Each structure stands twice: as structure tokens, then as C-alpha cells.
């Protein structure tokens, strides 16, 4: 009897592909919706996750690491290098909690799927006039056009991150008067390396330009007085390529007055971008920004 006929008669199922197994396990672990998008021609399989809870993304990251799947923020603004392999896009739209925090200073804690219309309605004027359906995660990932050294104008006070290795960490004010410690060994290694990079020749060349031309805002480590260093500003404009944003603490900020322009980038900006990417995501868990401005969107 032929092996295929024997398997049919005995009720054996054909062996699943790793991608099918990945999707099956993802659907079992996550409360949100998982959708197979099929094959991207010449690149690889694609799927979409709409998480119902923060833990869904943590489960997805772990499975992506196990199966070699890149995890991307859905509708993030690139340009991105092509992902030659499996890709899971995550739509944070269901993670849309927004709460004003107690205290005399107006502050809000927002999940990544909060639409900008809701933030503007709450009184956060830095979102006035922006696309109301854009999510906070997409806004944070988009090119950040605040003037050099003035990332504090964004109103971002702190970000809760899921890092490439699965560590969850909060980045925020960083100085002698700030009492929130860096809890994880991952970030305790990351932050000194970023400060060293900020003091090097690549960052100096970017600071010598009329405006900060690099996509990643390493100038956040040398803010314009009276602002002080806030590590949360490192993810402004990150494109979803450095970490997954679980939540953001916001104050009232200002709309950027600069315009993001690829033409303003000095030649050292690409090398600086690659160094920062390697520090945050040495495993390639997230997409990579394209070296050229005419790269693809995912």
C-alpha cells in the first residue's frame, strides 16, 4: 500500500509547515484575532494580529522569536527594507485605553491603539490637525520633526516598551533627580552604550547639520535647556523597528515646527541608524528602516 494511501486510511494528517504551526499556536495563545494574509510575492508569508490585550503581543513576540518571524507595527511609516521571510503585522486598534492620571499636572496614560482624535479631544494640543484615525503607536513611529534637542515638545513623558528579547521596561526621565530605576539588565547595558554613541563622531556630524537629520532621535540625550534627558524620546520616529510600544504617558505638548526631510540627513545618519538599531534589536525581531528614502512600506 502506498504511504499516502496508508496515511489517509489511518487518519493521519499531513505534516504542517512551520508557518501553519506558528499561526495555529498564535491563535491558541492570543485572545485577539489572527488572520492569514497569504504569501507576499517573492518575500514570504504574511499575517495580521489584532491583539485584545497587552499579553497577546508578548505571546506573539515569543512565538516570532521561536519561528523566525518579523513582528511589525501595522501601517507604520517607513520606508522599510524588504522583509524576506515571514512577517506578522500587529494592529493595536483594540488596545485603546486612555486615562487621565491623578495629580495637579495634566497627564494621561494611553495605550498604543488610541486614535489621535481622542487625544486631541482630551486636550493634548500636539495632536490637533493630525489624522484623527491614526493611532498613537503610528504617530510615535512616524518621523519626528521636532527641532534638534527639543524632543520634550512632543509631550511624551514615558514609554512602556516590549523589547526585542522580551524584556518589558519603562523609559522616562533620566537624571540625578529622577528616582525611577532601570529595572532590567538589558536596558542597563543599552543606555550607557547609547550615551557613548551620542558622544561619538557619527552623532556629532548629525548635530552639526541645520536640523537633526537621522531618523532615530539620539539628540534626545543632549536636550536643549531647560529640558533634561528623557529616554522615552529615543523612540520618537522609530518606525516600529526598535521595540513594541505598550503604553505612553503624555503631557500637553506642541506641534513640531520643523519638517522631516530626508534631504537634510548627513551621510553619517545611515551609519548612526544602523548602530542604534543593532543596540536595540540585535536579533532582527522587528523590521529595518531602508537605507534609501525610496524604500518600501510593509
Residue spans for each PLM region:
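N-terminal basic/disordered segments at the start of proteins
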Residues: 1-44, 277-278
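General beta-strand structural signal in soluble alpha/beta enzymes
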Residues: 3-5, 9-10, 33-37, 49-51, ...
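Short cationic amphipathic helices and targeting signals
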Residues: 10-14, 44-52, 106-110, 251-267
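Glycine-rich N-terminal segment of FAD-binding domains in flavoprotein oxidoreductases
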Residues: 28-102, 106-112, 120-124
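Substrate-recognition/cap regions that form aromatic- and gly/pro-loop-enriched pockets
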Residues: 60, 64, 68-70, 257-268, ...
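FAD-binding subdomain of flavoenzyme oxidoreductases
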Residues: 124-255
Amino acid at each position: 500500500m502506498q504511504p499516502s494511501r496508508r496515511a489517509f486510511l489511518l487518519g493521519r494528517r499531513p505534516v504542517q509547515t512551520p508557518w501553519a504551526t506558528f499561526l495555529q499556536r498564535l491563535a491558541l495563545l492570543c485572545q485577539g484575532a489572527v488572520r492569514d494574509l497569504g504569501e507576499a510575492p517573492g518575500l514570504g508569508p504574511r499575517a495580521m494580529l489584532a491583539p485584545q490585550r497587552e499579553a497577546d503581543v508578548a505571546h506573539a513576540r515569543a512565538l516570532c522569536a521561536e519561528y523566525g518571524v518579523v513582528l511589525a507595527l501595522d501601517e507604520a511609516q517607513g520606508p522599510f527594507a524588504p522583509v524576506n521571510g515571514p512577517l506578522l503585522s500587529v494592529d493595536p486598534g483594540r488596545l485603546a485605553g486612555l486615562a487621565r492620571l491623578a495629580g495637579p499636572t495634566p497627564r494621561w496614560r494611553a495605550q498604543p491603539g488610541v486614535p489621535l482624535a481622542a487625544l486631541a479631544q482630551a486636550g493634548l494640543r500636539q495632536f490637533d490637525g493630525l489624522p484623527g484615525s491614526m493611532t498613537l503607536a503610528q504617530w510615535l513611529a512616524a518621523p519626528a520633526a521636532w527641532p534638534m534637542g527639543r524632543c520634550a515638545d512632543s509631550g511624551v513623558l514615558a514609554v512602556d516598551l516590549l523589547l526585542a528579547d522580551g524584556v518589558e521596561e519603562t523609559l522616562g526621565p533620566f537624571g540625578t533627580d529622577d528616582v525611577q530605576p532601570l529595572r532590567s539588565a538589558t536596558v542597563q547595558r543599552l543606555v550607557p552604550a547609547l550615551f557613548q554613541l551620542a558622544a561619538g563622531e557619527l552623532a556629532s556630524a548629525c548635530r552639526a547639520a541645520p536640523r537633526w537629520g537621522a531618523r532615530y532621535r539620539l539628540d534626545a540625550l543632549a536636550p536643549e535647556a531647560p529640558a533634561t534627558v528623557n529616554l522615552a524620546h529615543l523612540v520618537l520616529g522609530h518606525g516600529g523597528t526598535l521595540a513594541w510600544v505598550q503604553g505612553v504617558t503624555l503631557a500637553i505638548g506642541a506641534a513640531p515646527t520643523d519638517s522631516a526631510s530626508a534631504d537634510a540627513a548627513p551621510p553619517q545618519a545611515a551609519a548612526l541608524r544602523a548602530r542604534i538599531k543593532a543596540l536595540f534589536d540585535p536579533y532582527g525581531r522587528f523590521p529595518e528602516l531602508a537605507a534609501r528614502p525610496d524604500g518600501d512600506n510593509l
